[in-house]
């Protein structure tokens, strides 16, 4: 059985192969999920984490998609979903003592943010 409840139009944006650990990006995304666009931008501006830069870029892209493709007002948008998935790791080697080498994994992640019009409920 399918439900016929109308859903709010959503726009999304993806950032792929972003340098940074998935856990560190999720720590920030958990803070902004469910907030309005304006509140999320203010929070991201004052958070002390390095991952806020790419997240802000993806969020602005999602809002631009909503504005251009769906004609929605940015002040009425809410972050409906924000996820981070693991990307490939770049493997590098660091020289160590006595001819050894340690492997360094430079992690990447994929960021997905969806925004929807705020519903009055």
Swiss-Prot record:
Keyword Flavoprotein: no
Pfam families, sorted: Ribosomal_L22 (PF00237)
Keywords: Ribonucleoprotein, Ribosomal protein, RNA-binding, rRNA-binding
Signal peptide positions (record): none
One Gene Ontology MF term: structural constituent of ribosome
Gene Ontology CC terms, in alphabetical order: cytosolic large ribosomal subunit
A single GO BP: translation
InterPro entries hit by this protein: Ribosomal_uL22, Ribosomal_uL22_bac/chlpt-type, Ribosomal_uL22_bac/org-type, Ribosomal_uL22_CS, Ribosomal_uL22_sf
Xref: PROSITE patterns: RIBOSOMAL_L22 (PS00464)
Superkingdom as given in the UniProt entry: Bacteria
Family annotation (PANTHER family): CHLOROPLAST 50S RIBOSOMAL PROTEIN L22-RELATED, LARGE RIBOSOMAL SUBUNIT PROTEIN UL22M
Entry's family note: Belongs to the universal ribosomal protein uL22 family.
Record's subunit section: Part of the 50S ribosomal subunit.
Function: This protein binds specifically to 23S rRNA; its binding is stimulated by other ribosomal proteins, e.g. L4, L17, and L20. It is important during the early stages of 50S assembly. It makes multiple contacts with different domains of the 23S rRNA in the assembled 50S subunit and ribosome. The globular domain of the protein is located near the polypeptide exit tunnel on the outside of the subunit, while an extended beta-hairpin is found that lines the wall of the exit tunnel in the center of the 70S ribosome.
Protein's recorded name: Large ribosomal subunit protein uL22
Gene: rplV
């Amino acid at each position: 059985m399918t439900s016929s409840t109308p859903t709010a139009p959503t726009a999304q944006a993806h950032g792929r192969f972003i340098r940074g650990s998935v856990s560190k990006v999720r720590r920030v995304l958990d803070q902004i999920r469910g907030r309005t666009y304006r509140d999320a931008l203010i929070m991201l501006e004052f958070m002390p984490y390095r991952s806020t830069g790419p997240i802000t870029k993806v969020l602005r892209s999602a809002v631009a998609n909503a504005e251009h493709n769906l004609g929605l007002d940015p002040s009425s948008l809410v972050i409906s979903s924000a996820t981070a998935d693991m990307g490939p790791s770049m493997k590098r080697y660091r020289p160590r003592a006595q001819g050894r080498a340690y492997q360094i994994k430079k992690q990447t992640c994929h960021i997905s943010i969806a925004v929807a019009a705020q519903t009055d409920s």
